[in-house]
Regions:
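Metallocofactor- and cofactor-centric catalytic cores in central/energy metabolism, strongly enriched
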Residues: 1-118, 132, 140, 144-145, ...
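Flexible, glycine/charged-enriched surface loops at secondary-structure junctions
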Residues: 17-18, 150, 221-231, 257, ...
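Short catalytic-loop micro-motif centered on adjacent basic/acidic residues
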Residues: 18-20, 101, 122-125, 151, ...
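Glycine-rich beta-alpha junction loops
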Residues: 25, 128-130, 156-160, 177-180, ...
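Residues on a specific face of well-ordered alpha-helices
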Residues: 61, 136, 140, 160-161, ...
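Phosphate/pyrophosphate-binding betaalpha-module
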Residues: 124, 128-187
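A conserved active-site cap/scaffold subdomain adjacent to cofactor or substrate pockets
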Residues: 151, 168-232
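Internal helical hairpin/lid segments
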Residues: 210-300
Length: 342
């Protein structure tokens, strides 16, 4: 029986484009040297699986508006601080007097609000199915603690709608293991009926190699497929507890993705009974239209239309020290991975 490495190195089938949906997969594939094993007819492209990267410019502008115009203390993950908005980043806003507090979880933000009752505190809630439950729990805790100074600015997204929107960009999706651990595999299985093929992958060298080998073998059969190559963590049903929590507190809404535009029913928002914690409603926020830097091709990278190295400012005007786009800022960003490992 051939090993996964032998299957990959000796692949002699048709050209195939495999999209790494997850930014962690992109970094690990680079770090482990897996790209060097691929024959020329196998192309790995990056996708929209970095939550910071797909967060639109308008969201950064909204956060800056809250901080500078409303005097709100912004609690955020560190990756978001240096992402450029239309005119500045959150780091730039901090230089102008904004209160930007870095936290490691929504629970930290809720705790901060409880310890600082004289401050209005908003947590920037970004991410996919893996992080949405934690944001919900922080809102529940705020209600239980009687906090009226805590809210969340929601930009949480769901992945299946993005897969469908990008189905013509790749032949096979390398599905993120941690997302499917929450959602289960049923949604991805159902996408095969739409012609979408994919494999769920873990994050070790063995797990990634196995998933890629399975993808190449199944692709040659010529019909849509789904295989769970991460069964020790991912089940068909996923985490029912997390799903029920999110369903109790949030509902689907149309959502803007950087580079992909508005994808129907791909976002989340707080249900009516929790809307006193919705920062957009609490502060009667006006509609803000963000304008990305025209030199940045982050949107094309996220759609698999180009590689980071195809961007004219990659490694020149745009570096991790001086990023123009979100894909260079985030630790999960494709541009960051290419810059670090190329």
């Amino acid at each position: 029986m051939k090993t996964a490495r032998e299957i990959i190195e000796n692949y002699d089938g048709p050209d195939v484009r495999i999209m790494e949906v997850c930014g962690t997969h992109t970094h690990e594939i680079f770090r482990l040297g897996i790209r060097k094993l691929l024959p020329k007819q196998v192309e790995l492209i990056s996708g929209p699986g970095c939550p910071v990267c797909v967060t639109p410019v308008s969201f950064i502008d909204e956060a800056i508006y809250l901080a500078l115009e409303k005097g709100v203390t912004i609690c955020t993950f560190g990756d978001l601080v240096r992402v450029p908005g239309t005119n500045m980043s959150l780091a730039g806003a901090r230089e102008q007097g904004a209160k930007i507090h870095i936290v490691y979880s929504p629970a930290d933000a809720e705790k901060y609000a409880g310890e600082h009752p004289d401050e209005q505190v908003t947590f920037l809630s970004v991410g996919f199915e893996t992080t949405t439950p934690a944001g919900c729990l922080s809102v529940k805790a705020a209600r239980e603690d009687g906090l009226d100074n805590y809210s969340i600015l929601v930009a949480n997204k769901t992945m299946p709608q993005a897969y469908e929107a990008l189905k013509d960009s790749a032949d096979v999706f390398l599905y993120p293991g941690h997302v499917n651990a929450i959602t289960g595999t049923r949604l991805c299985e159902a996408l095969t009926e739409e012609g979408v093929s994919g494999v769920v992958a873990g994050f070790t060298a063995k797990e990634l190699m196995t998933a890629l080998a399975v993808a190449l073998v199944k692709f040659q059969e010529g019909k849509p497929f789904f295989v769970n190559c991460y069964p020790r963590v991912v089940t068909q049903d996923g985490s029912r507890e997390a799903q029920l929590l999110v369903d109790e507190m949030m509902e689907a809404c149309d959502c803007e993705w950087r580079g992909l535009g508005v994808i129907p029913k791909s976002g989340m928002k707080l249900r009516q009974e929790w809307q006193e914690f919705d920062a957009r409603l609490k502060y009667q926020m006006p509609k803000i239209e963000g304008k990305p830097n025209p030199a940045c091709r982050c949107g094309d990278v996220l759609q698999g239309k180009c590689k980071p190295s195809d961007c004219k400012v990659f490694g020149k005007g745009c570096t991790p020290q001086h990023p123009i786009g979100a894909c260079m800022v985030s630790g999960e960003g494709a541009c960051s991975a290419y810059y670090q490992y190329s």
